[in-house]
């Protein structure tokens, strides 16, 4: 591939559509500074995919769009198009079959770029892939912009390796390896996550296996623990009852002894109080005397401390005086030493000044001779330069004419070849079949109509779905509420029935009844239905008869009674024996009322009558208790009436207390709370623990059963409503889902048809556009061939004239060069002498400044020594005066007086302490007597307190263990055989503790461990299979990376060797000698950087950074051209690469470019006349209108004349 033209529109300063033709292999771009030449380089870099605004000399990517000028408005978009000649089919992939390839990029103000290849919209990656490995790209070595040569030569080793990789064409391997590494990294991350999950899951499986074993052990231990704990509570309860009786007897005996001791202690308390007052007065007198002694002792201590401080101050002053004497001697000696140093350095300073004077005179003498020698050398240099310029101009003109001739020949040949290719391509263009396109469009229209129908159906169905879902949700909530209520009612009913069943089992009695076949006889309370509020009244009258076994058959009841008489039951038992006759008479008697004939009342025999019964003036109304009880079995009605005969129900027993004497014998009144009033007593019967509440619970069970039946009917209805709502919502949801699936299918078909129609339409447009483009290109080729033939004829005539003039100018140049060499030698010798004198003068002046600095330091030190000596003498006098002022005689006299006062106060304190001792002895005697009495009574009080605590503890223990047994639902009958063995409490305690310890040692027990273990094992098997798949994928990816690395290493190593060899050959050609090479910074070429070693002729520099700017530029050019020879890019762009080069090196550079142009097309920007001479074609860039660049035709001769200021 080679670049045939470059099209710009709206890009930076190229606001108008501009076409730059590049038919030759050496195309120069010329023009004044700031006219926009470098924008051509930026345009090529931009269209190849550059995304960094800084690389395009802008702050943002929108800066490449023309932003207006003084006469132009900003434009909305920028576009750049590269057109390549692909006659040899070197393009990559599907584009190799095109004779021409155009690459285009468009950017608008929104900041969005679009890329096209042959007018087909592509991705940026597709553009980069097209040139991958060719040396072209946004950051490849084939586009050398301003300053890039210096950046290449100063690049890091890793960056230079990147250039080598591009030259080797391994960047595509790098991309493949990067993608493979990404997939490998993802696979390893997934494997690491799987390993973590599998490890965690494995640990959990081990844990679950242990938990499953623990759960079985837990059930076994828990059953044994419950049994032993209940047995222990039963033993402790029995022992607590025995302890309670024993402690109560001991407490009564100890209480009587306490009362006698309390009277005697009262008398002794009175005597103790009088003795305590006398002791307090003596103690106050001792306190006063002791305070006086403390004050005297404090004064003595203060005076002793003061004398000690005076002695220490005197010793410190004497030590300071000795130190000051030493300091005075030191500073005196220091001042004498500094005076001797000052004299020595003064003499050295005078000698240094004399040497500086002599050196300065010699330097001035040599410097006066240099201008004359330098002027002579400059004259010879000017003569040689003039001769060289004349020869260079002539040779340049000769090369230009040769270049013009060769360029014209190549251009003609290229135009003929291009015309043939374009004509062939025009004949081979085939557009799409119009019939197929019409069929596709018709099918697309039909699919769109079908799509609209389905969308309407879906739009109609979707609004109905929320209503159906809401109805389903309401039905579901109602059904759940009904089920919750059913569950609550069943739980309540079942709990009550269990309580009734436990009451009916009757502990030990149940076994006895079962053994004698009496367990099927129902208790009496099951046959009764009591009016609300009178349960406790009926229980108070019936008491144990409430649990009496009943039978409607009198014979069966008598048989049960005979069984009881034959074998005594283990607990209380009643057998109801219904009478065969006489029941009506008893009910008639009940209707006579509870009072004797003197005080009759109105009696109601039923609950209904009770509400209307009116009391007489004598007593309130009453109701026969039997009238409040309904009997389910009519055969037992008489029996119940017999049991309740003589019992009357009253609302308020308080009203009957004054009338109790009038009650008839064997008659009683019963209140709602179960209190019973007879003629002689008011009795409150505590509820029987076994039968208490059975009537109320039975009534509640019957109510719950009725309510439960009603809710079950409601639950059936709610379930039917839920099924209907679920069916409606499910059908509607399924219909919507089906419509959505059909809609997605049709949309996919519509999209596919749209794509196909668009492809056919675009193909038709591209074919037509390409035919028109080829016609325009062929017309341009005809005009270009005519112009190139005229250029060929003119170049051949000018070439002959320039050859004769060049030979004469070479002879004049050789003579001028010899004269210049002699005069340069004389100038170098004079400069060496001047430098020697300057160094001598510099050393003398440095020595002079050093001596002056030393003298200043000595003067400062002398001043400091004098100041220090004066300070020491002054402080010495002050300390001597302070020592004379120190006196301690007055403090010694005051101390003696204080000691005498302290002696007197010690004697007074001793007398008062004796009086206090006598009072204390009297108080002690009385208190000892009281304490002895209290001590004698204390054991008795303690005994009483202990007994009271023991009694409370026993009562609490009984209640506690009773409560525990009830809460644990312990079956005492089942525990009786174990209790008969008289187990010891300590043994049971150890067993319970052992079992509890073993249960606690098990820790938290997961009873669902088995299910969790099965689930975890299945999941681990699935994860193990996934891990195997990932390991195989990782092995495959690692093999691919190793294969890529191997191929890359081999290709990169070959490239390195070839480029290094070519670099070593090109470097001496550009420098006229020297050596250069590339050196790896590591052993592995894939990771190692590359350093450049370059040594021009006569230099042994250790680093390329020591080279001049021109030498660095030539070195970088040699390196880039070495890469070109290995992997020639389709074209190379050079932006003022020759700027830092002198004429000689510019000529070498131009010759090198010319030789390289046989394989690579070069497009260069230059201001150098020498470089322009080598161009086969010149493209001029001007900016006649401010801010707007244009391309113009350039006459090579006129360009050379404008580039040479001397020719103007």
Swiss-Prot record:
InterPro entries: P-loop_NTPase (IPR027417), RecF/RecN/SMC_N (IPR003395), SMC (IPR024704), SMC_prok (IPR011890). Gene3D superfamilies: P-loop containing nucleotide triphosphate hydrolases (3.40.50.300). CDD domains: ABC_SMC_barmotin. One of its GO terms (molecular function) is ATP binding. GO terms for cellular component: cytoplasm. Belongs to the SMC family. Homodimer. Contains large globular domains required for ATP hydrolysis at each terminus and a third globular domain forming a flexible hinge near the middle of the molecule. These domains are separated by coiled-coil structures. Required for chromosome condensation and partitioning. This is Chromosome partition protein Smc. It comes from Thauera aminoaromatica.
């Amino acid at each position: 591939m080679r670049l045939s033209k470059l099209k710009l529109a709206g890009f930076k300063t190229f606001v108008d559509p501009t076409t730059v033709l590049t038919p030759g292999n050496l195309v120069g771009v010329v023009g004044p500074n700031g006219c926009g030449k470098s924008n051509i380089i930026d345009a090529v870099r931009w269209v190849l995919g550059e995304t960094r605004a800084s690389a395009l000399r802008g702050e943002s990517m929108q800066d490449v769009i023309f932003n207006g000028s003084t006469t132009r408005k900003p434009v909305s978009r920028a576009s750049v198009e590269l057109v390549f000649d692909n006659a040899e089919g070197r393009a990559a992939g599907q584009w190799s079959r095109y004779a021409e390839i155009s690459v285009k990029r468009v950017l608008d103000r929104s900041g969005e770029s679009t890329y096209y290849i042959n007018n087909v919209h592509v991705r940026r990656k597709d553009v980069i892939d097209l040139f991958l490995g060719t040396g072209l790209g946004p950051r490849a070595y084939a586009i050398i912009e301003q300053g890039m040569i210096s950046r290449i030569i100063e690049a890091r080793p890793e960056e230079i390796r990147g250039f080598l990789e591009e030259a080797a064409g391994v960047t595509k391997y790098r991309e493949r390896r990067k993608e493979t590494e990404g997939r490998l990294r993802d696979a390893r991350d997934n494997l690491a996550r799987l390993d973590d999950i599998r490890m965690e899951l494995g640990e959990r499986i081990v844990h679950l296996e242990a938990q499953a074993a623990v759960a079985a052990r837990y059930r076994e231990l828990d059953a044994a623990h419950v049994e032993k704990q209940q047995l222990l509570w039963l033993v402790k309860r029995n022992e607590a009852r025995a302890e309670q009786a024993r402690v109560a007897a001991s407490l009564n005996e100890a209480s009587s002894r306490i009362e006698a001791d309390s009277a005697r202690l009262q008398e002794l308390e009175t005597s103790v109080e009088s003795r305590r007052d006398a002791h307090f007065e003596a103690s106050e007198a001792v306190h006063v005397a002791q305070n006086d002694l403390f004050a005297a002792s404090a004064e003595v201590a203060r005076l002793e401390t003061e004398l000690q401080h005076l002695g220490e101050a005197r010793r410190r002053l004497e030590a300071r005086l000795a130190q000051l004497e030493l300091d005075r001697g030191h500073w005196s000696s220091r001042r004498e030493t500094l005076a001797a140093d000052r004299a020595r350095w003064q003499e050295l300073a005078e000698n240094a000044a004399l040497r500086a004077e002599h050196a300065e005179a010699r330097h001035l003498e040599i410097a006066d001779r240099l201008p004359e020698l330098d002027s002579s050398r400059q004259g010879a240099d000017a003569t040689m330069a003039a001769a060289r310029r004349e020869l260079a101009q002539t040779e340049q003109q000769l090369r230009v004419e040769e270049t013009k001739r060769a360029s014209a020949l190549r251009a003609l040949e290229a135009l003929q070849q291009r015309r043939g290719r374009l004509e062939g391509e025009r004949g081979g263009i085939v557009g799409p079949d119009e019939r197929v396109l019409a069929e596709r469009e018709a099918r697309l229209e039909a699919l769109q109509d079908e799509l609209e129908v389905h969308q309407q159906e879906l739009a109609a169905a979707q609004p109905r779905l929320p209503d159906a879902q809401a109805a389903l949700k309401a039905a579901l909530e109602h059904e759940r509420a009904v089920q919750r209520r059913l569950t609550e009612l069943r739980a309540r009913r079942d709990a009550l029935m269990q309580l009734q069943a436990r009451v009916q089992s009757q502990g030990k009695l149940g076994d006895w009844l079962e053994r004698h076949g009496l367990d099927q006889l129902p208790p009496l309370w099951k046959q009764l239905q009591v009016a609300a509020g009178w349960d406790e009244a009926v229980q108070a009258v019936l008491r144990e008869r409430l649990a009496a076994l009943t039978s409607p058959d009198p014979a069966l009841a008598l048989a049960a009674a005979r069984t009881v008489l034959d074998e005594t039951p283990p607990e209380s038992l009643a057998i109801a024996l219904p009478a065969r006759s006489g029941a009506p008479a008893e009910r008639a008697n009940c209707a006579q009322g509870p009072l004797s004939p003197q005080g009759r009342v109105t009696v109601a025999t039923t609950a209904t009558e009770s509400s209307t019964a009116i009391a007489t003036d004598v007593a309130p109304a009453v109701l026969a208790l039997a009238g409040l009880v309904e009997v389910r079995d009519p055969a037992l009605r008489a029996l119940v009436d017999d049991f309740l005969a003589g019992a009357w129900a009253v609302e308020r027993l308080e009203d009957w207390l004054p009338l109790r004497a009038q009650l008839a014998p064997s008659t009683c009144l019963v209140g709602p709370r179960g209190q019973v009033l007879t003629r002689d007593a008011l009795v409150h019967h505590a509820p029987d623990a076994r039968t208490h509440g059975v009537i109320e619970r039975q009534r509640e069970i019957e109510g719950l059963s009725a309510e439960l039946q009603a809710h079950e009917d409601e639950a059936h209805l709610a379930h039917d409503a839920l099924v209907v709502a679920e069916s409606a919502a499910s059908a509607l949801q399924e219909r919507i889902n089906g419509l959505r699936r059909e809609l997605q299918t049709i949309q996919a078909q519509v999209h596919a048809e749209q794509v196909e129609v668009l492809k056919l339409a675009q193909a038709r447009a591209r074919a037509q556009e390409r035919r028109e483009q080829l016609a325009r290109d062929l017309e341009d080729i005809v005009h270009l061939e005519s112009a190139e033939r005229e250029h060929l004829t003119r170049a051949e005539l000018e070439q002959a004239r320039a050859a004769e003039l060049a030979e004469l100018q070479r002879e004049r140049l050789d003579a001028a060069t010899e004269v210049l060499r002699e005069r340069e030698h004389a100038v170098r010798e004079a400069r060496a002498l001047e430098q020697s004198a300057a160094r001598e003068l510099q050393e003398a002046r440095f020595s002079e400044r050093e001596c002056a600095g030393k003298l200043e330091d000595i003067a400062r030190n002398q001043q400091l020594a004098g100041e220090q000596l004066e300070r020491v003498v002054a402080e010495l006098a002050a300390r001597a005066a302070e020592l004379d002022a120190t006196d301690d005689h007055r403090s010694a006299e005051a101390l003696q007086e204080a000691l005498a006062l302290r002696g007197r106060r010690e004697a007074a304190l001793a007398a008062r302490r004796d009086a206090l001792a006598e009072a204390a002895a009297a108080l002690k005697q009385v208190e000892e007597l009281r304490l002895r009495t209290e001590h004698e009574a204390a054991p008795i009080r303690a005994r009483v307190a202990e007994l009271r605590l023991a009694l409370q503890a026993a009562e609490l223990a009984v209640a506690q263990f009773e409560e525990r047994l009830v809460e644990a639902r312990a079956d005492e009958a089942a525990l009786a055989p174990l209790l008969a063995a008289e187990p010891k409490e300590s043994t049971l305690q150890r067993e319970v503790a052992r079992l509890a310890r073993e249960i606690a040692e098990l820790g938290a027990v997961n009873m669902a461990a088995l299910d969790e273990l099965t689930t975890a094992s299945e999941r681990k098997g699935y994860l193990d299979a996934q891990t195997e798949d990932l390991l195989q994928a990782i092995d495959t990816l690692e093999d691919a990376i190793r294969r890529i690395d191997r191929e890359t290493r081999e290709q990169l190593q070959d490239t390195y060797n070839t480029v290094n060899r070519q670099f070593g050959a090109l470097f001496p050609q550009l420098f006229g000698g020297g050596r250069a090479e590339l050196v790896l910074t590591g052993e592995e070429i894939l990771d190692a950087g590359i350093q450049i070693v370059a040594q021009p002729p006569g230099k042994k520099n250790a680093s390329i950074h020591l080279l001049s700017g021109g030498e660095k530029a030539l070195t970088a050019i040699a390196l880039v051209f070495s890469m070109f020879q290995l992997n020639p890019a389709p074209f190379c762009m050079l932006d003022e690469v020759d700027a830092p080069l002198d004429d000689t090196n510019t000529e070498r550079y131009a010759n090198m470019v010319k030789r390289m142009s046989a394989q690579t097309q070069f497009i260069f920007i230059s201001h150098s006349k020498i470089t322009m001479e080598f161009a086969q074609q010149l493209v001029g860039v001007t900016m006649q209108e401010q801010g707007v660049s244009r391309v113009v035709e350039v006459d090579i001769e006129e360009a050379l004349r404008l580039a040479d200021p001397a020719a103007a």
